[in-house]
């Protein structure tokens, strides 16, 4: 049943995200464990930053974990405003919202790790960054 809801949610999620600012990364042959990664950050009314990371592993049985941070650049360095973690088998979609202040550059900083199964052997890990000014 969970997979049915994922399949129903994916087209809707993609349509919404296409209207926002995103960065897509497709797998190379030597990018073990990953098939596709999308990361995005957009700003809504009243300063709501909507940010997300989606990981599609190269096999649907693989488990992926996303560690995602929203950071603001000020004083010459990046400051973490909020962070969280989400893990799932097959497609892993993790989105958050956080209110921010205008006049800064923000970034989504996500580390994605792919495992053979939940609690299983690590296959690969990579970091993805997307910046946007508000």
Predicted regions and their residues:
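N-terminal prepro-regions of secreted/extracellular proteins
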Residues: 1-45
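Short, surface-exposed binding/anchoring microloops in extracellular/periplasmic proteins
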Residues: 30-70
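Hydrophobic residues positioned within well-ordered beta-strands of beta-sheet architectures
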Residues: 37, 51, 66-68, 94-96, ...
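Short, aromatic- and glycine-rich surface loops/edge beta-strands on solvent-exposed regions
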Residues: 104-117
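Short beta-strand elements
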Residues: 118-134
